[in-house]
Every structure is written in C-alpha cells, then in structure tokens.
C-alpha cells in the first residue's frame, strides 16, 4: 500500500491507497493563511504525525506528495498558491519517515491517477485540467504523461490572457486564474 498526500492551496489530504487505486482511508485538514515558516511547519508536523499513524496500521511501501506549482525530485521550487519557494520538503520528511518519498506537481498526479484508475483509463490521449485554489493541467499522450521535466506541466492558470491585466501573486499581470477566481467570487456575493 501507498500513502498519497494532496497538498492543496486550502487543505492537506492524506490517503492510503491499495494496488488497484482504491482509497482505504483518508484524513483531511484545512490550511489557514499564515506566513511561510508557519505553513511549512504545519505541513511537516501534520504529514509526519499522520504518516506515522497510518504506517502503524498498514504496510506502506512509499509516500507520494502532490503539490501545485513547480517541483523537482525532492523540493518545491515554487508554489504560488501556497507561498512556498525552495522548500526542501522531502529532505525534512525523510529524517522522520523511513520509506521512499516522491513529490510531483498535483495536476500531473491527478492526470496519471485518472488515466490509470479513473474516467480517462479508456483514452490514449487527454488533456486534464485541475480547478481548485489555482488552475493547473497535464497532457496524456499514448497513455503516458507528457514529460515537462521540472516545469509544472500545463499551468494554464498562469498564462496571461490580458497584457496589462490584474496583478497575480506570481508577479505577472493578466493571469487566467485571476479572472476565473473573480468570476467565482462574483457568483458567491
């Protein structure tokens, strides 16, 4: 069995998954806005505490972490929606948890999961979009994830749709994500 961790802009979800992709157990926590150091500490403590708890209950072979933004094999290069940059999460967790830990962009993880176990498994090619705190995406060609290296994937949320548009947290102007969020906020009011 494996532990999957979804580190979102507003929550952390930790689940135990069997070899068929079935979620056996799931734990969730909402994240509150805080400064970077507090967020990092909160994330680490929550993951370590719950991973250890789940490892006592199940035989866990590895842990996978899905996070929005740009990541490499062991750290978050930049996650705009979480306010994280150069965060060595894998190194920090490995000192407390003795199983292999992998990290990948959340949209890529979701696309792989849907292509393997979910609604996309009967398709050879697909474009997968994630809509949450931000907007992300991934492309599947011939049942394989389009490799974008350490780049985030198809982060359409940070593609500029208006040259001199609204300033985004990423530092650019006119990001698609800002306009979708504004539309969503208008509907809520």
Task: List where the protein language model places each region.
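Short glycine-aspartate micro-motif
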Residues: 2-6, 60-64, 126-130, 169
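Active-site flanking residues adjacent to catalytic metal/cofactor-binding acidic residues
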Residues: 5, 105, 149
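Conserved Rossmann-like nucleotide-cofactor binding loop
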Residues: 10, 22
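Short, acidic Gly/Pro/Ser/Thr-rich loop/turn segments
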Residues: 12, 70-72, 136
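Glycine/GP-enriched mid-protein hinge/lid loop-to-helix segment characteristic of carbohydrate kinases
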Residues: 15-18, 26-28, 36-40, 102, ...
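Short acidic/glycine-rich beta-turn/loop cap or linker motifs at sensory/regulatory domain boundaries
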Residues: 18-20, 72
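A structural motif specific to WD40 beta-propellers
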Residues: 24-26, 77
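Glycine-rich phosphate-binding loop and adjoining helix at the ATP-binding site
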Residues: 31-48, 52, 58-63, 70-125
